[in-house]
Amino acid sequence: MKFEQPLQSATLLKRYKRFLADVVTANGEEFTLHCANTGAMTGCATPGDTVWYSTSSNVKRKYPHSWELTQTQSGDWICINTLRANTIIADAIEAGDIPELSDYDEIRREVKYGSENSRIDILLKSNHKVDCYIEVKSVTLLDAGMGYFPDAKTERGQKHLRELTAIAKSGLRAILFYAVPHTGITQVSVAKEIDPKYDLLLKQACDAGVEILCYRINISEYDLTIGKQLPFISKG
């Protein structure tokens, strides 16, 4: 996925109210960015980090600039715009770059499903195999090379696990896809200390047949592409 226009850089001053961040450019201009990330963003929003942002052509937007990437002071690159992951994964599936999700005839996005009024991120359909429901999550919480999800308690994430579990029990294919847009993460696990209920529901989902896939997202200020598969580490 190429960015529509080259990203521009600034230095992060602070993130606040979840959806806003103040930055300063090299020439001293200060302004506010929109932040499309509801998570805690632990380690992704340290004052002094380099922020890469896009600019919308929509003149009606109150905050025309959107925070896309963080370049940390330790050298890691992180895509903090969680809206990007679904597009990257869908594009990679269509291009045949994810072997586990190949040989489907049709890909749909944001399809209503389940008993809790949910929308599945990606639905794959085929004339010769069962439907495949894919829920995409972005992993950006880093600790000593391990990426953890979630980075904050997530009732929405819990709901998605219940929905995927029901899909798997019905005989259809259900996949929890951890996209890893963080160059410092080499493997993925669940953050059970942060959200014990999510950890329990994930175990139940796996027991029901829900599959887990983890793939790195390659990051630059020009584009985002699918990278190599990463291991998921279960911690009992």
Curated annotation (Swiss-Prot):
Gene: sfsA
A family per Pfam: SfsA
Entry's family note: Belongs to the SfsA family.
Entries under InterPro entries matching the protein: SfsA, SfsA_C, SfsA_N
Species for this entry: Proteus mirabilis (strain HI4320)
Protein name: Sugar fermentation stimulation protein homolog
One function term, GO molecular function aspect: DNA binding
Gene3D superfamilies noted in UniProt: 2.40.50.580, 3.40.1350.60
